[in-house]
Regions:
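Small-residue-rich packing faces within the transmembrane alpha-helices of Major Facilitator Superfamily
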Residues: 17, 37, 41-45, 124, ...
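Transmembrane alpha-helical segments that form core, pore/gating elements
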Residues: 44-47, 100-101, 106, 137-185
Length: 185
């Protein structure tokens, strides 16, 4: 990886991390669903006039938008609003990888291999450690935690829709997909 690529990768990590801080601050002034809706409106509304609708079946676009754009962020914003620490939410949200593997096995008949099963076991152990107050010393409201897991599951469902979308097109316009799916909420 070149130095430029490394700096760009670091920038992505910083922006991603700041996203959770901005959510936390924004929730002090606005209800969670309104903040989430505003977030997507600010992305989608001006961009749809410049970016063509992706050439994918409407049902897949709607499914992707409902899971990635609406449900994931509705659950996440509500979780943080109900007391889930933003930093912890960013970690728990990564359970989407576990959910994606499991959904991929059920949806596409993908086979799970030893390394994947070991990763799943490690992920479940990590989630259990995060839940256990005596192990991490941080009180987490169970409702916030469960809403964050629901957000992770929604993200995983979106990943499944994304895989289906990719199979319908030889070269889908990813930016177009993201922008137009943001209209769904």
């Amino acid at each position: 990886m070149s130095r430029k690529d490394g700096v760009l990768a670091l920038l992505v990590v910083v922006v991603w991390g700041l996203n959770f801080v901005v959510i936390k601050v924004g929730l002090h002034n606005m209800p969670p669903l309104m903040l989430a809706g505003l977030r997507f409106m600010l992305v989608a509304f001006p961009a749809i006039f410049f970016v063509a609708r992706p050439k994918v079946p409407l049902n897949l676009l709607l499914g992707y938008g409902l899971t990635i754009s609406f449900a994931q962020f509705a659950f996440l914003f509500c979780a943080i609003n109900f007391g889930m620490p933003a930093g912890l939410a960013s970690l728990v949200l990564q359970a989407q990888a576990f959910f994606t593997i499991m959904l991929g096995a059920f949806t596409f008949g993908e086979r799970l291999h030893g390394k994947q099963l070991a990763g799943i076991a490690l992920a479940i152990f990590g989630v259990l450690v995060l839940i256990e107050d005596s192990l991490n010393g941080q009180h987490v409201a169970m409702l916030g935690f469960m809403l964050t897991l629901a957000a992770a599951f929604s993200w995983a469902c979106g990943n499944i829709f994304n895989k289906k979308i990719m199979s319908h097109s030889t070269r889908p316009a990813v930016m177009s997909l993201v922008i137009w799916s943001a209209l769904i909420p």
